[in-house]
């Protein structure tokens, strides 16, 4: 199955082949700020699953608060939508903003990262694997 992720203005698009390797929500400050929401929702694919990229992309590179690797975040140069990212600590994987896909193309998240930082009002689907829970 081929899936297409698009930015808000439609100038950027990314085609992906196959199923994601990971479907996760993250509650860290970085993901909350990236999305402007209570958490970030991401899907990860092997680099070879990325078929095509189109549109004007801008790069923002930084070291995450964890200090692990360097993240390269790509967003639409026209509208600012975060499209995808890579991290030197996870070679061969491309993370993508799940909200850029049509909602029916992805199932619910299967992992909740840094769950101890989750907003108290956020509930998760049954069966989600939790890491980083509060002590």
Language-model regions, residue ranges each:
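A short Gly-Trp-Pro
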Residues: 1-135
């Amino acid at each position: 199955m081929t899936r297409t992720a698009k930015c808000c203005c439609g100038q950027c698009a990314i085609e992906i082949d196959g199923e994601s390797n990971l479907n996760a929500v993250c509650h860290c400050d970085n993901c909350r700020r990236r999305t402007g929401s209570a958490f970030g929702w991401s899907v990860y694919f092997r680099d070879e699953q990325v078929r095509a990229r189109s549109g004007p992309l801008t790069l923002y590179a930084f070291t995450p608060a964890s200090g692990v690797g360097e993240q390269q975040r790509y967003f639409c140069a026209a509208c600012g939508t975060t499209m995808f990212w890579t991290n030197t600590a996870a070679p061969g994987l491309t993370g993508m903003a799940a909200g850029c896909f049509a909602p029916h193309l992805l199932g619910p998240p299967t992992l909740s990262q840094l769950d101890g930082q989750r907003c108290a009002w956020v509930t998760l689907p049954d069966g989600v694997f939790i890491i980083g829970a509060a002590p």
